[in-house]
Amino acid sequence: MSTMPVSLMDIVVNGYGASLRKKGNRFVLDHGGEVQEFSADMVRQFILSDSVSITSGAMKLAAEKGIDIVVLSRSGMPVCRVYPCEPCGTVTTRKNQLAAASTAAGYLLSAAMVSAKVTNMANLLAALGKSRNNHDLRSAAEEIGRLADAIPPEGTPSMQGALIRGIEGRASRVYFAALSLVIPPDLYRGRRSQHPAEDVFNAYLNYCYGILYNEVEKACILAGLDPYIGFLHAERYGKRSFVYDVIEQFRQPVVDRMVITLAVRGRMQREDTDERWYLVGEGRRKAIASTLQRLDEERVIGGRTTSFRSAILENARSIVNYLNEGAVFEPFVYRWG
């Protein structure tokens, strides 16, 4: 069994055969006689992977304490989560979210989030180009910046949705091609590959995006948003399409910069994946620990000291204010020094 109390609040259980049960106000992890206990007052979230069993008593205690329990697939995506039955937010929020999905209000929100993603890609490449004095990286950043400027300022999801998805796609192709100037070729083939990945770098991206998705989904639920009512990714029927909308703002600041650092500093190896390019063992542990650390590290964002985890929740709450009160929505744009 491998358990990692990454912080006082996040407990990662990564091992076959582990069990989680309740003992008074404590959680007990047991694997083959190796026992660890955690006070329920000190836990924010349990992240479970592989085959882990959990008792109903442990789930009830977690619900009473507002503790999130999420189960990850081998690709890092959450496949289920346990949270209290009491609904978060109001009916008004979800009604307004559903109404906005087909109106100009929904388009403005989704366009702002795509613009933030494209701008973040440009900003990251510009920072990499500056630190490496690389003209090609800076040129790619400028090309992506021009694509961000091409996003129409007005429209509806049905009228302009395909256009801004196309802009996002072109920007992504330029961005991931440019990363081949930074990532060693034995780790990265110069293009984005998802499920399955085609190389170690994409395997890390996939898994870490899954952990980020978990955090964004949780923020949407806490803010009272419906994860299934999406604007830009509305075509993903049966999927949590709104989570895919919101996450776009955070991919480069939270995950990409971190995974690039792992690659260029020699902390990423072929042995971190299996023959089908899924992270295993030490690779999975590095991905989880690095992403959670990245989420919790304090940094200056928007002129004040906070964390990416807090910024994600604040972003979800600002979406609620936009939908319910018509407040100005400022998407999450990150600038590297």
What are these regions (language model features)?
Residues 33, 42, 63-65, 71:
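An N-terminal structural lobe/cap that precedes and organizes the functional/catalytic core
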Residues 1-23, 30, 37, 79, ...:
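Active-site helix-to-loop segments that bind/position phosphate- or nucleotide-bearing substrates
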Residues 46-49, 67-73:
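Short hydrophobic alpha-helical runs that function as membrane-insertion/retention elements
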Residues 64-70, 77, 86-90:
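A short alpha->loop->secondary-structure connector
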Residues 40-54:
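Extracellular/luminal Protease-associated
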Residues 55, 75-81:
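Short gly/pro/ser/thr-enriched loop/turn and capping motifs at secondary-structure boundaries
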Residues 31-33, 50:
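Short, well-ordered turn and helix-capping elements at secondary-structure junctions
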